[in-house]
């Protein structure tokens, strides 16, 4: 499944709508998506939304749509 993650780049500063960023990632469920972002970034997650159907098709039309991947931390 594809998830849209809205976040702030910093966990210290209070969230502001004007500074909210977005990333897209593929994960098995919303918990796995949150874990991936929390384990690999310092971001303050505001919202994680599953994208399906028309919502996914709409987001894919954006030139900013790109799936984010994280390197595995397995040794």
Curated annotation (Swiss-Prot):
Keyword field: DNA-directed RNA polymerase, Nucleotidyltransferase, Transcription, Transferase
A GO-annotated cellular component: DNA-directed RNA polymerase complex
A GO BP annotation: DNA-templated transcription
A Pfam family this chain is assigned to: RpoY
Keyword Ribosomal protein set for record: no
GO molecular function, one term: DNA binding
Domain of life: Bacteria
Enzyme class per UniProt: transferase
E.C. number(s) listed in UniProt: 2.7.7.6
Catalytic activity: RNA(n) + a ribonucleoside 5'-triphosphate = RNA(n+1) + diphosphate
HAMAP family linked: RNApol_bact_RpoY
Oligomeric and partner information: RNAP is composed of a core of 2 alpha, a beta and a beta' subunit. The core is associated with a delta subunit, and at least one of epsilon or omega. When a sigma factor is associated with the core the holoenzyme is formed, which can initiate transcription.
Membership in a protein family: Belongs to the RNA polymerase subunit epsilon family.
Role of this protein: A non-essential component of RNA polymerase (RNAP).
Name of the featured protein: DNA-directed RNA polymerase subunit epsilon
Provenance organism: Lactobacillus johnsonii (strain CNCM I-12250 / La1 / NCC 533)
